[in-house]
């Protein structure tokens, strides 16, 4: 095999490790969630998680994907790209924080606003840094970060849900 083909195979396997293993392990956590959380708590947590995933592309203008794409262009200053990406992410997080004052003001979601904001900010910055790692061709770092994130998520879920019995708040803190 040629050098480029070996690199492609290696990078593909590392990306698969970083993505697939994380998704599989989180999928295997579903029985824990359904046994510890009530139906209403699980529905609320799913609503918050889905809302984060839906808001992210609009609030951040998908800057993480742009950072990855332009990092791959060798003539660009990748640190400057990351800096711009972080600024745009913070602006998006600020808009989401303002909007959340209306959304979380009443109803069943009262009391979850700060969990939502921290979850959104964490997801946004994590996604940006992961895309930056991919764009900088640091595929090994990308995979290690994905696995570490999954291990931290599972560990926090076990501690917060099983050991401390924090229910939905424990689930959201682990998120």
Q: PLM features: residue spans?
A:
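Alpha-helical transmembrane segments and their helix-entry boundary regions
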Residues: 15, 42-43, 81, 139-145, ...
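Transmembrane-helix boundary and interhelical linker motifs in polytopic inner-membrane proteins
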Residues: 2-6, 34-41, 55-90, 134-140
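Small-residue-rich midsections of specific transmembrane alpha-helices
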Residues: 19, 24-29, 46-71
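Residue-level recognition of pore/gate-forming positions within transmembrane alpha-helices
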Residues: 19, 23, 50-53, 89, ...
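N-terminal membrane topogenesis motif
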Residues: 1-25, 76
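Interfacial/gating helices of multi-pass transporter permease domains
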Residues: 30-54, 168-171
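Hydrophobic alpha-helical transmembrane segments
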Residues: 114, 144-175
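Alpha-helical transmembrane segments of multi-pass membrane proteins
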Residues: 54, 58, 90, 94, ...
């Amino acid at each position: 095999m040629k050098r480029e083909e070996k690199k492609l195979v290696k990078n593909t396997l590392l990306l698969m490790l970083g993505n697939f293993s994380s998704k599989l392990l989180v999928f295997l956590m579903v029985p824990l969630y359904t046994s510890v959380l009530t139906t209403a708590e699980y529905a609320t947590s799913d609503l918050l998680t889905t809302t984060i995933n839906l808001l992210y592309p609009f609030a951040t203008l998908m800057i993480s994907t742009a950072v990855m794409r332009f990092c791959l262009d060798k003539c660009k200053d990748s640190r400057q790209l990351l800096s711009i990406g972080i600024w745009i992410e913070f602006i998006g997080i600020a808009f989401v924080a303002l909007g959340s004052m209306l959304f979380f003001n009443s109803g069943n979601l009262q009391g979850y606003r700060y969990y939502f904001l921290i979850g959104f900010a964490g997801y946004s910055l994590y996604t940006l840094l992961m895309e930056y790692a991919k764009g900088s061709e640091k595929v090994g770092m990308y995979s290690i970060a994905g696995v570490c994130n999954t291990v931290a998520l599972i560990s926090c879920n076990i501690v917060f849900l099983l050991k401390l019995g924090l229910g939905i708040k424990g689930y959201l803190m682990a998120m």
